[in-house]
Amino acid sequence: MKAIIIYSGKGGVGKTTTTANIARLLAKQGNKVFIIDADINTPSMNTEFEGDHPHEMIWVHSSGNMFSKFIYLEKSMVRQYLELAKKKIHSINPDYVLIDTPPSVTNVHIELLRSEER
């Protein structure tokens, strides 16, 4: 399994669209792709797949609006979200994991890097 993190410090530059397009390309090549929508305050990856989702080769792990009421996310909340993603990854066993990140540097980025160590 290979992991690819799509990151930019600025919002609105196409991270989500780029992630979705990479996922579609990899799926067309026969790869199973798992996407983590790590922009958990304003997730939008599911909207990228309206109409053709669920795709048989692409799975999206999104927080929906579960964190929308929080201005600041505690590390433990982020850790819990990522642990759930890991469980799904182990059950699906994808060829690629794509991670669509939020802009700037947040607890999400810190926990993503820490989870890579584990």
Segments and roles (model prediction):
Residues 2-3, 52, 56-58, 111-114:
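N-terminal regions of ATP-driven nucleic-acid and macromolecular assemblies
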Residues 19, 45-47, 108:
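Short, function-defining helix-loop hinge/capping sites that tune catalysis or transport
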Residues 101, 105-112:
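Conserved ATPase-coupling elements of RecA-like P-loop NTPase cores
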Residues 117-118:
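Conserved small/polar residues in nucleotide/adenosyl-binding loops
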